């Protein structure tokens, strides 16, 4: 590790002459990931790889440090009154390989990206796209089968960036040079980023050195002063960030939107029927699961779709309202006992397996969850990676704030585990509805169907954290737990 850091430091020696500290020189960033994942190609990107892709490649739009949509290859756009047409005006300039950036070439890139994502959950999010049209000059139109208010957020995903490279790098705002297990990222000149030329622009940017480290190594280097920012923390490794006084920095928690719960993978034995699957959901004290982590503001939910989405009209509420956890566990234990009697296994407990990570927080979560299940007569055991578990811990940040994203994660075509074809059919009806009230009603009904199927047992929103030294600018907590490298590379004026 010391040799790799020395290599990176030598590579930056010319850039950093006379500079020190995050305000004037290089910004050292650790992303909790493996080098293989962090610098992966293709469309199945880890969270870390999404940060790298977004720095080096752009699509029509991108995300800023607050998670808001900003111009990228398109410098402006309009949405028609019916919400079914998004018209983009491409910025001036060429592709990195010198070819002209035209509406026709952008159309071809978009269609290729959409085809590549077929069969993925992000591909399902793109299903309402009916046509991509090249209009006059640098104008591209995306036509939809029905309104998609969050389309810009979907188009800003790194997997939809155009990966074209030339001597000047890719389509994104930064140049990347690999060094060992990391890389050096530097900002391109303004004109290559599609913005007006500015004299002395170099004074307002800094190089960013990114390393792939495991959580323990990243936290250790942060505490030693070798790292300014750590990205990519989750519940599994949060306890590492809480070890010792963080006198040199701050733990920043993203108020993330997404999934955190159990997906039923095996529809046999005790989990064959929805009533027994519901028994598991009833027995969980969600607040107690997360209490050992001492996270302020985290709100448990029994809903598949996180409360507060813009389509949420209150048609689906929290389950078992008015029932105490003791009452729920009594009902759940009765169902477990009845199933054992019906299957002539009165002398054996029900055994279920779970697949989850192996970090300290996962062990703590498993211990609490196993203890709660034991109260209703179920033994919960961990299985190793590669085994087929009964239950899978889902810990996934949403791409956009909509019912559609949550429901698409359990679409039967993805073959991730148990699903509901009835819910999928209702989502399909929602996508074809041109009236937003009708669309929202279908989505609420789809959530209700998926809830009744008990194929997913929600705990609450996912937990994401970062370590950020106090004098670092360009970082903002946001619902997507996405912290763009260009924002971290930009100095305040």
Which residues does each PLM region occupy?
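Periplasmic-binding protein-like
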Residues: 267, 271-312, 324, 450-455
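Structural transition elements
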Residues: 299-341, 359-363
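Extracytoplasmic/peripheral linker and loop segments enriched in polar/acidic and small residues
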Residues: 381-384, 406-470
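Long beta-strand-rich cores associated with HINT superfamily self-processing modules
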Residues: 468-493
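Gly/Pro-rich hinge or "lid" segments in bacterial periplasmic/extracellular proteins
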Residues: 146-208, 214-217
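Aromatic- and charge-enriched surface segment that lines or borders ligand/interaction sites
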Residues: 76-119, 221, 270-272
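Extracellular/periplasmic solute-recognition and catalytic clefts
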Residues: 180-186, 196, 209-267, 291, ...
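N-terminal lobe/hinge region of extracytoplasmic solute-binding protein
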Residues: 31-81, 111
């Amino acid at each position: 590790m010391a040799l790799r850091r020395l290599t990176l430091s030598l590579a930056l020696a010319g850039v950093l002459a006379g500079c020190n500290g995050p305000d004037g020189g290089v910004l050292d960033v650790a992303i909790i990931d493996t080098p293989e994942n962090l610098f992966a190609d293709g469309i199945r990107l880890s969270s870390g790889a999404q940060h790298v892709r977004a720095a080096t490649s752009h699509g029509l739009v991108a995300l800023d440090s607050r998670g808001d949509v900003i111009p990228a290859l398109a410098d402006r756009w309009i949405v028609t009154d019916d919400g079914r047409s998004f018209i983009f005006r491409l910025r001036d300039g060429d592709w990195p390989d010198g070819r002209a950036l035209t509406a026709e070439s952008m159309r071809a890139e978009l269609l290729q990206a959409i085809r590549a994502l077929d069969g993925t959950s992000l591909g399902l999010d793109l299903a309402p796209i009916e046509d991509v049209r090249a209009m006059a000059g640098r104008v591209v139109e995306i036509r939809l089968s029905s309104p998609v208010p969050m389309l810009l957020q979907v188009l800003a995903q790194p997997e939809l960036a155009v990966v074209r490279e030339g001597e000047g790098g890719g389509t994104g705002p930064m140049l990347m040079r690999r060094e060992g297990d990391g890389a050096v990222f530097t900002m391109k000149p303004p004109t290559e980023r599609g913005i007006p030329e500015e004299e002395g622009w170099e004074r307002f940017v800094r190089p960013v050195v990114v390393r792939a480290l495991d959580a323990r190594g990243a936290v250790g280097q942060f505490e030693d002063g070798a790292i300014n920012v750590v990205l990519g923390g989750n519940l599994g490794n949060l306890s590492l960030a809480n070890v010792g006084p963080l006198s040199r920095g701050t733990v920043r928690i993203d108020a993330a939107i997404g999934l955190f719960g159990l997906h039923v993978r095996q529809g046999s034995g005790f989990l064959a029927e929805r009533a027994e699957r519901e028994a598991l959901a009833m027995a969980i004290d969600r607040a107690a699961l997360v209490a050992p982590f001492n996270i302020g503001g985290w709100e448990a939910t029994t809903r598949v779709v996180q409360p507060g989405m813009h389509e949420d009209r209150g048609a689906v509420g929290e389950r078992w309202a008015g029932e105490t956890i003791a009452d729920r566990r009594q009902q759940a234990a009765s169902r477990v006992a009845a199933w054992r009697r019906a299957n002539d296994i009165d002398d054996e407990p029900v055994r279920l397996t779970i697949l989850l990570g192996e970090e300290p927080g996962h062990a703590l979560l498993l211990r609490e969850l196993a203890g709660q299940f034991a109260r209703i007569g179920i033994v919960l055991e961990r299985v190793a990676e590669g085994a087929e578990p009964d239950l899978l811990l889902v810990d996934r940040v949403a791409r956009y704030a909509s019912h559609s994203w949550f429901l698409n994660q359990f679409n039967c075509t993805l073959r991730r585990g148990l699903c509901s074809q009835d819910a999928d059919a209702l989502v399909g009806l929602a996508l074809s509805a041109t009236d937003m009230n009708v669309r929202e009603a279908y989505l609420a009904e789809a959530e209700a169907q998926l809830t009744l199927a008990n194929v997913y047992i929600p705990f609450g929103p996912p937990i994401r954290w970062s370590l950020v030294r106090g004098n670092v600018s360009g970082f903002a907590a946001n619902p997507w737990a996405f912290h763009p490298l260009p924002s971290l590379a930009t100095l305040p004026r």
